[in-house]
Amino acid sequence: MPGKELSDPCVDCRDAEAILTLRRRRLCKDCYIKFVSYKVFKRMENYRLNRGFAKDKPCKLLFPLSYGLSSSVLLHMLHDQLEVQRSKVHGSPGFDLHVLIIEPSTISPSNPAHDEGFELAQKCFPLCSFTKVPFHSIFALVPDIKETMSQFAGKGFEDDPSLSDAERLNAFRSCIATSTSKADVDHILMNRLIVAFAKQMDCQAIIWGDSDSRLAAKTLANVAKGRGSSVIWQVSDGMSPFGLEFNFPLRDLFTAELRDYASFFPELTKLIVPDEPLPANTLTKNLSIDELMMRYVLTQGEKYPGVMLNVTRTANKLDVSQMPANLSHCTFCAAPLMNEVGGGHTQFCYACARSRPSTSS
């Protein structure tokens, strides 16, 4: 008996109706998931096969989860890989994944605590281990950060040891003047917290959940802010200045493609906290450079996805080995100091100097 004729067959399997267009190809649900997941599968190959790591034990990886679309989708894909890895009796040790969550409400009071998301993640991804920490735990994880903050803020900030860690962190953050500087400083502090936690857990690498769209925006924003030298490790796979590998498995996938993937899984819909859309009438001067670049990439990326993909691919070709040896590094962000002149007891890179309260504008 002949099978039912399909009006719009999937171009890959030819056995099911196509429901989505992926890069000009009409695919069914299963083939769409397979295509998107394979992009991440290939990017995780070195960790799955323990290339460059001990062969007798799993490679320990840290994964920061923000409850955003990209990191939530990536966690779902990585857990699928863990399930396959554990099902193989004689396979390589592969990797273990520890998930770190910085409590959203401690980053901004406008962010929901999302405690139900933490419980849901533990339930949906049982092969991962989880830790949740507040933003101000940076003081415990990075012991010298208090002195660094005081030097960074200069005379415009006076640390009060009688305050709680949360209050001290908020006091420091509130002395940063502009929206761009605030976003820049917050990103650096969160990055240092995550790196310090990864080292405490004896992890070999950090897996970041940035999509191609996010990496393109990050590249453009970093160059605009004067952080061109840090693009190498902020958007490229490889060794970071912190002695840990950074890896971005979603670099070949667009935000829109991740959104379609998430729509197939109800648990992801419950886990993801959607980004609040910026009002169309928001004044440009009230936006940070990071927000401006993300808005630009999301709007132009829909029209010219290939251009945004080239931005990320070009940045990924930067070779950290071509950097001059024996460079000193910025005390605040760890970027290599090229031509900067240090002052006082420490040195800050050009971009950090611009973000300091005494110089930001």
Swiss-Prot record:
The keyword tRNA processing applies. One of its GO terms (molecular function) is tRNA binding. Pathway: tRNA modification; 5-methoxycarbonylmethyl-2-thiouridine-tRNA biosynthesis. It comes from the Eukaryota. Keywords: Cytoplasm, tRNA processing. Gene3D superfamilies: HUPs. One of its GO terms (cellular component) is cytosol. Plays a central role in 2-thiolation of mcm(5)S(2)U at tRNA wobble positions of tRNA(Lys), tRNA(Glu) and tRNA(Gln). May act by forming a heterodimer with ncs6 that ligates sulfur from thiocarboxylated urm1 onto the uridine of tRNAs at wobble position. Prior mcm(5) tRNA modification by the elongator complex is required for 2-thiolation. May also be involved in protein urmylation. PANTHER family: CYTOPLASMIC TRNA 2-THIOLATION PROTEIN 2. HAMAP family: CTU2. This is Cytoplasmic tRNA 2-thiolation protein 2. It comes from Aspergillus oryzae (strain ATCC 42149 / RIB 40).
